[in-house]
């Protein structure tokens, strides 16, 4: 599985071992279910778990606690949305999505989109980053670092920015 994703295959031996440990934890703690008749294979489970484990490679796996299901659609899925404008008018629309993370609820992925990592975007990592971000109770781009009091938010942001630049 690691060889299927260049950004995972590039990890050193220690990082690969840690990624496998995090992946095993994730597979033991989350159910991965297919939607719209999708049969989720072992490769799919391992693929999702390995990619999802990258954001917590050197963090506590407990950061992914508080929810228990990953739902995988064969391709993009449609989500009904509504938005209220400044005049109070509610606009309802349907959005095509590759992924969705709900606070306290499941994480939803399009399998087709999990196979597309272009221009530095990876839907698995993106949605799992939202799960980290939502631990603080709202999505503001900064995950709760309570499990790691030694990590300083300013340093964390700088490391994230530097890592993203290298990833892209």
Residue ranges and their predicted role:
Residues 68-70:
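Extended, charge-biased low-complexity segments
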Residues 32-39:
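Short, surface-exposed loop/turn segments at secondary-structure junctions
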Residues 3-6, 14, 23, 27-32, ...:
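Metalloprotease/metallohydrolase-associated module, dominated by Zn2+-dependent proteases
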Residues 12, 119-136:
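Active-site recognition of the HExxH zinc-binding catalytic motif
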Residues 18-19:
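Cytoplasmic (intracellular) domains, linkers, and terminal tails of multi-pass ion channels
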